[in-house]
Swiss-Prot record:
Family: Belongs to the PIH1 family.
Coiled-coil parts of chain: none
Swiss-Prot/TrEMBL keywords: Nucleus, Transcription, Transcription regulation
The protein's role, per its UniProt record: Involved in the assembly of C/D box small nucleolar ribonucleoprotein (snoRNP) particles. Recruits the SWI/SNF complex to the core promoter of rRNA genes and enhances pre-rRNA transcription. Mediates interaction of TELO2 with the R2TP complex which is necessary for the stability of MTOR and SMG1. Positively regulates the assembly and activity of the mTORC1 complex.
GO CC entries: cytoplasm; nucleus; R2TP complex; ribonucleoprotein complex
Location(s), subcellular: Nucleus
Gene of this entry: pih1d1
Single Gene Ontology BP annotation: box C/D snoRNP assembly
PANTHER family the UniProt entry points to: PIH1 DOMAIN-CONTAINING PROTEIN 1
Protein's UniProt keywords contain Endoplasmic reticulum: no
Protein name, entry field: PIH1 domain-containing protein 1
UniProt xrefs under InterPro entries: PIH1/Kintoun_subfamily, PIH1_N, PIH1D1/2/3_CS-like
């Protein structure tokens, strides 16, 4: 396949090009950070109690999960039951995400006087009300919440759970720190050098039969533990940044180009600092460049 010279390559052919490439990356990163508003990256919230479920780990350890609510966390898209079923039956049901904050484990005492481990999970208040009154959404959310706990704390939870009656929470509910969403994640560039900042959508909608775009990922420096990663994604059919939905995980890039254009879901070789990452879409080259600082060892 003939390479596209508009894309930066991780393999440069000369020391001069290598030095020029590094200067461009560092300059772009510095400019993006200078344009970001100087606002707090996180804030402390006091969640409200909702309900509590009881389950256990694969080692039979008793686990309680407090499902809490707050207006400080955004709600997922408001779907009907039929729309949720269609998403769950699709090839990639992960496109529908529920924003949530998963707290640290804390030890409490149950009604029998025995010690137990409790986790607090906080979601949007409006979605909580819908989920609590709708069995399908409740089953879906609890499954997603358990998967979140399993991934974060590397454990296996039984799906045989029950909701506690007449008890909204186990133990005490602590304040949680949540990241604010004030930073723009995608910046649009054109020949006039004017840039339109777009907020990062938290959730993307499922599209049918999207195309996987061509991309490259470069590490800087190229040897040893890198300081940051740069991903370049070729999107020739995208005309505006408004059609892009970008979601950066700790070690993952998920990108949607709407309507029904592109879908990219890849894992990164290193964990990144999500809140310090940024992206630029160049309307001339149709290339989305994502600069991602790498977590230190």
């Amino acid at each position: 396949m003939e390479s596209d010279k508009s894309l930066l390559s991780a393999e440069l052919n000369s020391e001069f090009e290598q030095a020029l490439y590094e200067q461009m990356l560092l300059k772009a990163k510095q400019e993006m950070q200078n344009r970001l508003p100087n606002t707090p990256e996180s804030k402390q919230i006091r969640p409200q109690p909702g309900f509590c479920i009881k389950t256990q780990t694969s080692e039979k350890a008793k686990i309680f999960i407090n499902i809490c609510k707050t207006n400080d966390i955004p709600a997922p898209p408001d779907l009907s039951e039929a729309e949720l079923v269609n998403i769950l039956e699709s090839d990639d049901p992960s496109g529908y995400r529920v924003p949530m904050s998963i707290g640290e484990p804390h030890v409490e005492v149950d009604n029998s006087g025995n010690g137990c481990t409790v986790y607090d999970i906080v979601i949007n208040s409006t979605f909580f009300d819908k989920m609590k009154s709708n069995e399908l959404f409740r089953e879906f959310f609890i499954t997603v919440a358990m998967e979140g706990l399993e991934n974060k704390y590397e454990m296996e939870l039984s799906r045989d759970w029950r909701m506690l009656k007449n008890r909204k929470f186990m133990g005490s509910i602590s304040d949680q720190n949540i990241r604010t969403k004030s930073k723009p994640i995608i910046q649009e560039l054109d020949t006039s050098s004017s840039q339109t900042l777009q907020s990062k959508p938290l959730i993307s909608e499922i599209q049918s039969s999207p195309k996987v775009p061509e991309y490259t990922i470069a590490a800087e420096p190229s040897e040893g533990h890198p300081s940051f990663l740069v991903a370049e994604i070729s999107l020739p059919n995208v005309t505006s940044v408004r059609s892009l939905v970008l979601d950066l995980g700790e070690d993952r890039i998920v990108l949607w180009g709407r309507p029904d254009l592109y879908h990219l879901d890849i894992f990164l070789p290193y964990n990144i600092v999500q809140e310090e990452s940024g992206a630029q879409f160049n309307r001339d080259t149709k290339v989305l460049t994502i600069t991602m600082p790498v977590q230190t060892i």
